[in-house]
Design a protein with these regions (language model features):
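Auxiliary Fe-S-binding modules of radical SAM enzymes
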Residues: 1-17, 38-41, 167, 171-255
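N-terminal [4Fe-4S]-dependent radical SAM core
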Residues: 1-76, 84
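General N-terminal targeting signals
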Residues: 30, 94-96, 152, 229, ...
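A very general structural signal that marks isolated residues within well-ordered alpha-helical segments
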Residues: 32-35, 118, 157, 218
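Small/flexible residues
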Residues: 40, 51-53, 117-118, 149, ...
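Conserved AdoMet/S-adenosylmethionine-binding subsite of the radical SAM
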Residues: 56-211, 223
């Protein structure tokens, strides 16, 4: 059963909380504000990351078991909304434990979204990449479109881009990319998202035959302006690919 308020996933799993600024998409980080307000946790490069409870860590096992018992389709898990899975300041063993959990929950498709593309590739070099782990990067502006190129080295069944908040027009090379999510920013200091920018991303996806998911417009509250684009709900999802488990060293060498 879906337990996440994020429209492109079924579940959200946070093995820890805490992060630090990485790029302009982080400027109005909702997670940092929520962590401080609700849990008294301060974020930053010199701040500790806080591991969540054992009960939280057991949730994916329960979700996986429920799917096995019901015989339903695989469900998506976003990991993590309150930090970054490839944050270098996270205790190394915690990340290893997450990947052990991924391998134990074969009925879950794990959406690993990061702003640390190079760190993701470095970690991928050390492991056999799970075939139920999707890899995604944030691409909020043209200066960070390079992240999309870096993750093409990882043999994930789905490689995706999160272009939310979309801060300017962006041109991306979508070969080797399987899914694009785009959207505007919400909250008190949201940055305006022009419709033309979204339509351009949608057009690039159509030309490349890449599924496009439009999440929301920019507004004070996330649902104030809805999520229709020209009267249409654009909620397309990707079909996972059967990619080889080894890292693409040619792509790595080119970065």
């Amino acid at each position: 059963m879906k337990n996440s308020g994020i429209s492109w996933t079924d579940h959200t799993f946070n093995p820890w909380m805490g992060c630090s600024w990485r790029s302009p998409a982080c400027d109005n980080c909702y997670a940092a504000t929520l962590a401080k307000r609700r849990y008294g946790i301060a974020w930053g490069p010199d701040k500790p990351r806080h591991r969540t409870s054992e009960a939280t860590w057991k949730q994916p096992l329960a979700w996986n078991r429920a799917i096995e018992e019901s015989g339903g389709p695989n469900e998506r898990v976003f990991c993590i909304s309150m930090g970054d899975i490839f944050d270098a300041e996270v205790e190394g063993g915690w990340r290893d434990e997450v990947f052990e959990l991924i391998n134990k929950t074969r009925r879950l498709n794990w959406l690993l979204l990061t702003k640390r593309a190079r760190e993701a590739v470095e970690y991928a070099k050390k492991i056999v990449w799970p075939d139920n782990a999707w890899i995604g990067v944030s691409v909020e502006d043209q200066a960070h479109a390079y992240r999309a190129e870096i993750i093409k080295a990882i043999p994930a069944p789905v490689r995706f881009l999160s272009m939310e908040p979309l801060l300017e027009p962006v041109k991306v090379k979508l070969d080797g990319i399987d899914w694009v999510i785009a959207g505007g920013e919400s909250g008190e200091n949201y940055r305006f998202l022009p419709k033309a920018w979204v339509l351009d991303i949608q057009s690039q996806c159509r030309e490349a035959n890449v599924p496009f998911f439009f999440k929301q417009w920019s507004s004070f509250t996330s649902d104030a302006l809805g999520h229709e684009l020209n009267g249409e709900v654009c909620h397309a999802f990707p079909t996972p690919k059967n990619r080889k488990a080894a890292l693409d060293t040619e792509v790595v060498a080119a970065k």
